[in-house]
Each structure stands twice: as structure tokens, then as C-alpha cells.
């Protein structure tokens, strides 16, 4: 999201790294709280802290189900598509040159978009659709006993998939919006220079 905003919306590139680190730190701390809160339950369900409960913190191909033959490459494709849809729709919802939702409804609608993507695209890779959302909790789980946090249920290095996929998909989705929709919207009309709006007259009292 942050990279796409910098590439297409004028967000300062010098702020991309601090914003990304802030998101990563937030996800990391949140995962530590979850890990702490469910210490006893996780120890009972999975004493070895294995792939069985890794999905509490981070994504896996087919959500760790070996009966669904999803590899890291299938999951990468899934992440690219899901994040592209997310960014295309976020740009559509927040573009003031179009018909944005009123009364500050944009955050609510973006939340619904994320839920919809999860319901439609969550089977293959758990819909991380944001590097920080996966990497932060994955790091937290690794530091608290999940030695296999970086690998999937097949033993393959998997941590890079929810990082690379959303980066590619985010730029792709934002670019598609700009090419297919954004460039056809009318330009914003600038206010004439030097004019001060006149106050509206007060209604006459009866």
C-alpha cells in the first residue's frame, strides 16, 4: 500500500521506510500480545510449537492443509492477484475525483473489501495482502519458540511469498486503476485566485 501510494499518489518516498517499519512494529507487538495471552492454550494444543499452530501468527499455503496441493508459487500468484484487487479498489474508493463514499465511510468500506478478499481468495495463501501483516507476527512467533516459522508445511522457505507478492500486486493494482480508470476522470477544478468566499446571509427571523 505505502509503495503504491508513493509510486502513484505522490506520497514522499523518504517516508516509505518509516511507515513500513511502523506497520511492521505494530504487527510484531500485536502478535507478541497474542502469543503471551494464549501461552497455555498453544502449549497444550501444540507442545512443540510446530506448523500445527503456526497459522495463528502467519500465513501458509492452503492454510497449512497438505490435502490441497498449493505450493509457494501458487501462493505467490494468489498474493499478487489478491493485493492487486485490494489496491485497485482502495484507489477507487479514495479517489476524490470519482464518486467517493460520503460521511467518512471509506475506512469501513476498505474493511469490507479486505473481508471480501479473504472470503474469495483466502484458501490458497491465507490472504496476507500486506507484508507487515505476515512478517511481523512470523518474526514474533520465531522469537518465542516457533523454530520453523520461516518454512511451510512442506519444509520450503515460505516467508518471502507474503512479502514479494503484495509488493508486486500492490503496484500492479494501483497501476491498473490509473490506466483503466483514473486517467479518464475529470481534473479537479482549481479555485480562482484572489477570491474570498462571501458568508451566507442569516435567515430572516419571523
Model-flagged regions — what are they?
Residues 1-206:
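Membrane-interface helix-loop junctions and terminal tails of multi-pass membrane proteins
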